[in-house]
Amino acid sequence: YVSPENPLYERQNIRIEDIDLKDLVILSAGNCMRDQIIELCQAKRDMPSHYSFESGSLDTLMRIVDCTSCLTIIPEMAIEYIPADHHDRLKMLAKGATSRKIAVAVRRTYVKSSIIKALTDTIMANVPVAKA
C-alpha cells in the first residue's frame, strides 16, 4: 500500500530492495506480521532497528500512508476491506518475496480434534495459496 507521494507509487510490482526503509510504516511490536516483514527485509539487507511510525492496526497504517509519502506492507487477505477509490495504492511485491507461514499450535492433550480439523480446513479454504 503506497502513498501517491512515494516514488514507488508509479510501479505495479515492487522489489523489497527498492523500498526505502525510512519510508516503511510497520505494525507495532508483538505482531507476528511485523516480525515477518522485518525478517523479509533483513534477508535482503540490513534493516535499521528503529522506525518513525508504528501502529497496532493495518487500518491505522494505511491512514498514516494516506497522509504521508510512506508505504506499508499489508496481507493480500486485507485487500477486500480497502475502499475501491484507494485500490490504485495497492502494489504487488515482486515474485518470490510474498509468502507467510500460518501454523496451528495445539497442546498434545487437547482432545477436541474435530474442532482443530474444522479450523484447519477453514484456514486452508480461505487463505490464498502462494503462487509459484
Question: Could you say what each language-model-derived stretch is?
Answer:
Residues 11-12, 18, 56-109:
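Beta-alpha-beta core module
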Residues 3, 27-28, 51, 74-75:
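Thr-Gly-centered strand-to-loop micro-motif
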Residues 2-24:
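Flexible hinge/capping segments at coil-to-helix
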Residues 124-132:
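Periplasmic-binding protein-like
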Residues 44-47, 85:
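Short helix-capping segments at alpha-helix termini
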Residues 102, 119, 123:
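Hydrophobic "lid"/C-terminal helical patch
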Residues 26-27, 47-57:
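Short beta-strand-to-loop elements that line the ligand-binding cleft
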Residues 8-10, 23-44, 112-120, 130:
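Secondary-structure junction motif
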